[in-house]
Regions:
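Flexible assembly/topogenesis modules
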Residues: 1-137
């Protein structure tokens, strides 16, 4: 690698729409829509703050709007019912998640989409110092 190159080159590839479905139902009321050619992507940029719990807080994520358009096109979604607004656990739930992406033009080559997820879980230790966990949920 080279220190002069960006290892996290997340190009937008003229992405125009992002939809997330949970168990067949669309997650947000309307999809994230972008138009990078006309610099209309602030809603998608704001998703980074809402999806990481930084929205309406006096802290940033180190990315500017120009960074977002120029190679840091990351999208974040909080799929918890309470938007991770509390120190409690949510009810266990199993289901399906579907990500629909719409591009303004056909892609010239295959691209990779990276999906990163965080899950709540409870680790317990008993008096014999055995660790009990359940990662299947």
């Amino acid at each position: 690698g080279s220190y002069n190159l960006n290892p996290f080159n997340f190009e937008h590839f003229n992405l125009t729409q992002v939809k997330i479905y949970l168990d067949g139902q669309q997650h947000n009321i309307k999809p994230l829509e972008t138009d990078f050619a006309n610099h209309l992507y602030v809603t998608a940029f704001t998703s980074l703050f809402a999806g990481t719990g930084k929205l309406y807080k006096d802290e940033g994520n180190g990315l500017t709007r120009e960074d977002f358009e120029g190679g840091y096109a990351l999208y974040a979604f909080d799929l918890t019912p309470d938007l991770a607004d509390g120190g409690h656990f949510n009810l266990l739930k199993q289901g399906n998640v579907r990500l629909d992406l719409k591009f303004g033009a056909a892609l010239e080559s295959t691209i990779n989409v990276i999906a990163y997820a965080e899950f709540e879980n409870c680790l317990e230790d008993d008096r014999s110092r055995n660790i009990i966990f359940d990662y299947k949920n």
